[in-house]
Amino acid sequence: MKRIVVEASASSANLGSGFDVFVIGLNDPRDSIELIALESQESEVNLNYKNGYVVPGIDATAAGAVAKAVANQFNLKYKIIVTINNRIPIGVGLGSSAASSVATAVAMNRIFDLGLSDEMLLSVAVEGEYAASGARHYDNIAGSLLGGFRIVHQMPLNTVGFSPPLGMTIVVVTPEIKLPNRKTEYARSLLPKQVNLDKMTKNISFATRVVAGFAKGDIAMIGSGLEDSVVEPARKVMIPWFDQVRDSALQVGAAGVFISGAGPSIAAVVDGQKIDPGRVQSAMTKCFADHGISAKGLITTVGGGARIVEEQ
């Protein structure tokens, strides 16, 4: 018997203008998976949650899809049992499916000594995103696997990474609202099919400020680039009172605010050496509450990435 436990971090994608390109890994929360491999005459994958609930149709789940894809690709004759311990809220724009996918890919790579590079792990893990959302997008996968701020280039697949500036803090607030089924697919369906040249120019300007801010270690510059002329205007209709919540965070000192992934979570970047992140969180949750919507908040930092916790 082989056994391994791997953790992978939550992530927050897009950062305004960087749709499907920008992502940050978060130090908290994190999902973990336990993977047990038993020698067998054929390849078999079983998926469980920590409470023992067995999930049917593993092809429709991120972790199960990754485990099965790797087993098939490398002709692994094992019974593979994957147990997921979810700590990342599911379906709120924090990369829960990416974290499960990444943790499973890292576990399979290590336990079977496959020698996969980071780019190959990204290619394997993205199959879980495809199973979960119907699209192969690498941003959350990169943030969950590698951590930090990542710029994702898909053809050929590679990433460029930056460490966060000292004091950079992320406040995430998630409203408790009704969401459509297969939310990510629906959120993508809202996007415009054509983009005005002026809007594209603005977005390039915003995106370059984010990159320059990370390169210079300038939180204020990063915050000034967390704007979007294309995707956020189309998607914010899914989040009641988004503009008001955004303004409430900026008024108490947040450097910038953006929709985390496909939402409904909203992320604020704060210079924790100058501004109390708790004050920003309170302003955002209060704004939702003033409009009759409950919201949960968390304060975290940029970092994350996948790591092996136990191995035998």
Task: Annotate each predicted stretch with a short phrase.
Residues G25, G143-M155, A267-D271, V309-E311:
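Short beta-strand-to-turn element immediately C-terminal to the catalytic PLP-Schiff-base lysine
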Residues T61-Q73, A207, V245-D247, A283-M284:
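Short, well-ordered amphipathic alpha-helical segments that serve as non-catalytic structural scaffolds
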Residues E7-S9, G25, S144-L146, H153, ...:
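Short beta-strand segments
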Residues F214-Q312:
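Glycine-rich, charge-dense phosphate/pyrophosphate-binding loop(s)
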Residues G167-D247, Q251-V252:
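Acyltransferase
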Residues A37, P175, A268-G272:
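Short beta-strand-to-loop capping motifs
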Residues K77-N158:
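Gly/Ser-rich oxyanion-binding loop with an adjacent helix/lid
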Residues M1-V92, R110, L114-L116, L146-G147, ...:
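ATP-binding N-lobe of GHMP and related small-molecule kinases
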